[in-house]
Amino acid sequence: MLTQEDVLNALKTIIYPNFEKDIVSFGFVKNITLHDNQLGLLIEIPSSSEETSAILRENISKAMQEKGVKALNLDIKTPPKPQAPKPTTKNLAKNIKHVVMISSGKGGVGKSTTSVNLSIALANLNQKVGLLDADVYGPNIPRMMGLQNADVIMDPSGKKLIPLKAFGVSVMSMGLLYDEGQSLIWRGPMLMRAIEQMLSDIIWGDLDVLVVDMPPGTGDAQLTLAQAVPLSAGITVTTPQIVSLDDAKRSLDMFKKLHIPIAGIVENMGSFVCEHCKKESEIFGSNSMSGLLEAYNTQILAKLPLEPKVRLGGDKGEPIVISHPTSVSAKIFEKMAKDLSAFLDKVEREKLADNKDIQPTQTHAYSH
């Protein structure tokens, strides 16, 4: 007749998966009940792995059959499966009311020019505005804001930087932290850390809007910013040519995937009016954006002409909204700032800015 000792000896042959000790030595056998060749076993293991339980169930059942057990009630208790942590909103710049990402699928479309003039136009609406140059590989903001020769200022603790001021806008750029013309040869993690530091280690103070001039593309920098602060708006800058619109679509798709409210598209250099003959020429073509607008439920936030004064103002550090406030482009930037402000009010009212759903998550589980 089968005894509890026989059962226990048989269980000593059952090795716990991925270890060298048996389940009896581990103390996993909690109860044995034996009545008329009907066996009940209670096994408690520290793993929630279904594979581990299945291996033990198969090996124990086989060992008990060899002992002549006709009816086996095998209960293998496991700890509850670890729950994935609930995503939470991350915000490295809680004193900033709205963060606006100025993006483009490719370089050379006027993204920095848009960032500079939009920031000043917002400041002219009596808003507290910051301008962050996150294009660490090609920082043009210092020159465009007339700050290329300025020295950075540390706070009294010597641990944080104070933004520089130009045209009523608080400004910070990696271009202020290293010599002009010096290249940065950084891998992704260094870039990501730099962007986080420009949010957390800069004393921005209380801002209504922080405009962030991003590097071209849809990579580490964009994802890092989106995960670091809730973004209130994404704006993509493009020219009308087809290859630029193709890249603009990628930028809009990034906004959608990162849950960034899309404020609109800036069509830059759409046309050129000759100062002498007044003839208007569409240098980059006149391709329709209706498909993009419909696909991403957005609007054309501004249509800017190719105006030589814009380029000249950028080179001299005198943005056109300052140097020629009555020009066509300056008036467009002025209207753009008002339209963006209305959009940001809507985002705040409807609580659309949140980055909890794009935070990286990692579940730690005991799997043996």
From Swiss-Prot:
Keywords tagged on the record: ATP-binding, Hydrolase, Iron, Iron-sulfur, Metal-binding, Nucleotide-binding
Pfam families the UniProt entry points to: FeS_assembly_P, ParA
Superkingdom: Bacteria
Gene3D superfamilies per the UniProt record, alphabetical: Fe-S cluster assembly (FSCA), P-loop containing nucleotide triphosphate hydrolases
Single biological process term from Gene Ontology: iron-sulfur cluster assembly
Regions crossing the membrane: none
An MF annotation (GO) of this entry: ATP hydrolysis activity
Annotated residues for binding of ATP: 105-112
Entries under HAMAP family matching the protein: Mrp_NBP35
Function (record text): Binds and transfers iron-sulfur (Fe-S) clusters to target apoproteins. Can hydrolyze ATP.
Family: In the N-terminal section; belongs to the MIP18 family. In the C-terminal section; belongs to the Mrp/NBP35 ATP-binding proteins family.
PANTHER family xrefs: IRON-SULFUR PROTEIN NUBPL
Subunit structure comment from the entry: Homodimer.
Protein name: Iron-sulfur cluster carrier protein
Name of encoding gene: mrp
